C-alpha cells in the first residue's frame, strides 16, 4: 500500500510541478508516459484474452503477484461467502 501511495504522490508532483512553470497539462502528462507506448500497444494489452477460472479445477494456478499486490484467490471469496450465511 505504501508503494502505491508514493507512486500516486510522485505522479501528482510530476504533473503539478511543470504546471507551475507555465507548461500545459497535456505536455506534463505526456512527459510521464514512455515514448514506446503507442495506441496500438495499449489496444493489444487491453484486448488480450484472460483465462477463465474454474473454481473446482484442482490444477488451478494462482495468479502472479504484480507490484507486490496479489489479487484475491477466487476460492477464498466463495469460502468467505459460505461463512457469512
Curated annotation (Swiss-Prot):
Source taxon at top rank: Eukaryota
Major localisation: secreted
Propeptide residue interval(s): 23-60, 76-85
Record-annotated disulphide pairs: 65-70
Keyword Cytoplasm (UniProt): no
Localization of this protein: Secreted
Gene Ontology annotations for the cellular component aspect, listed alphabetically: extracellular region
A GO MF label: toxin activity
Keywords associated with the record: Cleavage on pair of basic residues, Disulfide bond, G-protein coupled receptor impairing toxin, Neurotoxin, Secreted, Signal, Toxin
Leader sequence residues: 1-22
Tissue-wise expression: Expressed by the venom duct.
UniProt record similarity statement: Belongs to the conotoxin C superfamily.
Domains (record comment): The cysteine framework is C-C.
Role noted for this protein: Acts as an agonist of neurotensin receptors. It binds to human neurotensin type 1 receptor (NTSR1), rat neurotensin types 1 and 2 receptors (NTSR1/NTSR2) and mouse neurotensin type 3 receptor (SORT1).
UniProt name for this protein: Contulakin-Lt1
Native source species: Conus litteratus (Lettered cone)
Amino acid at each position: 500500500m505504501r508503494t502505491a501511495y508514493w507512486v500516486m504522490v510522485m505522479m501528482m508532483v510530476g504533473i503539478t510541478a511543470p504546471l507551475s512553470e507555465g507548461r500545459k497539462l497535456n505536455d506534463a502528462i505526456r512527459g510521464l508516459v514512455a515514448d514506446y507506448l503507442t495506441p496500438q500497444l495499449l489496444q493489444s494489452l487491453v484486448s488480450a484474452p484472460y483465462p477463465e477460472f474454474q473454481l473446482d479445477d484442482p490444477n488451478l494456478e494462482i495468479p502472479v503477484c504484480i507490484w507486490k499486490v496479489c489479487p484475491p484467490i477466487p476460492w477464498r471469496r466463495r469460502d468467505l461467502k459460505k461463512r457469512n450465511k
